Amino acid sequence: MKRTMRKMAVCGAVLSLGGLSAFGAADLDAAIGWLEAKGGEIVRKAERKMDDGRTVYAPQAGDWYKAAWLRDYAMTQAGGLIPKEHQNGVAELYLSAVTPEGDGFDCIKFDGSVMQRPGYNRISGKPVMDGYTYVTAVIYETWKQTGDAQWLKPEVLDTLAKMLDRMPHRNGLPWINPEEPHERAPWGFNDSVQMTGNLFFMSLLEIRARRELATLLTAAGRPDAEIAAQRQRATELVLLVNRTFWDDAFGLYRAATVRCRQHDVWGSAYAVWLGVAPDDRADRIARYFRDHYEGIVQRGQIRHMPAGEYWDKTCWDKKDHYQNGHFWGTPTGWFCWTLERVAPSLVDKTVADLIADYKARGPNERVFGETTSCPEYLTSVATPLQGLKRLQAARKGL
């Protein structure tokens, strides 16, 4: 990451974590410690039992989500919150839910019913797009965290490769057909958004999955040609993403190429997180976040799009609702990692505001003013935690 001079004073009014007027290293350490403790508490509450006795995890501690969601689990696992003793069982369950053709899924009900589409199979007509990538994420993290060599078996890695190739593409990028109304949902945090054409965030998820698969193939001692093919595909996707979605006049990436071409705040931050955005574009994204901070951040939580933008089409067509204007904690770590390039003190404000809101109202799925929804939501803790740990290491020069 491009290093910048740290400012001692925090932009705006900052709620201190450590009782100091300025936010320092100890405060970031305290924020991380608080998220770890709160995340551990929530993940225990989110434990559920399948009918076969297997331990799985709902996305939140309450009863709103009555299934084990793939992407939420993958993101929570990447944040380091899933106990190691349960990871193999969940990975086995998710791998077993992949169809012989290589189609993924959205979630699995506790009775074992596989839901390929969002809304318990009520939204869209075909399997959700991100299911093709998040099984790879789960297998990768399970292998990484447990060291279990069963996840390097040929049948496992071949299934992951089949899934990535099965995902619909056009022009070399993930694709939803504009000719079929809401043919399928994109990724889960946009599952109510009826975007079509080539998809920006899904392209990022595929890049990440291809890189992870290459690492797994390497660890398994697979042929160099297989490993090189996955790395080359990831490299090609990076080039295509930057050629297709970047809006140079605006300074952010667009979410899709046909319907819902709005600018993607979450995705632009994630592109920096993954190293997909070149340095000059990463700096422009960071400056956009700094200069438009008040419109895209609320209590340390992040809007999907710039202020004043709304998706062309959603399942409910309501503005300032759900994924069409609410503010979410899930992407805050990516956002802070990006903003650090140009405004470290504003990062400190974001972290302090996030923790203050979480302490006051709990880690919710999303907020809008005084409105909160779905309390004790796991990715609202796990994904910022992952981001802040990386930020902490970078600030310490590790």
Residue ranges and their predicted role:
Residues 1-11:
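Bacterial N-terminal signal peptides that target proteins for export
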Residues 26-44, 70, 81, 94, ...:
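Active-site acid/base region of carbohydrate-active enzymes
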Residues 11-19:
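Bacterial N-terminal signal peptides
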Residues 66-174, 203, 328-339, 347, ...:
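Aromatic-rich carbohydrate-recognition surfaces in CAZymes
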Residues 39-48, 95, 100-101, 110, ...:
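Non-catalytic carbohydrate-binding regions of carbohydrate-active enzymes
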Residues 57-63, 106-134, 165-232, 239, ...:
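The feature captures the catalytic groove of carbohydrate-active enzymes
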Residues 22-24:
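Boundary at the C-terminal end of the N-terminal hydrophobic targeting segment
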Residues 40-70, 78:
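Asp/Glu-centered strand-loop micro-motifs enriched in Gly/Pro and often flanked by an aromatic residue
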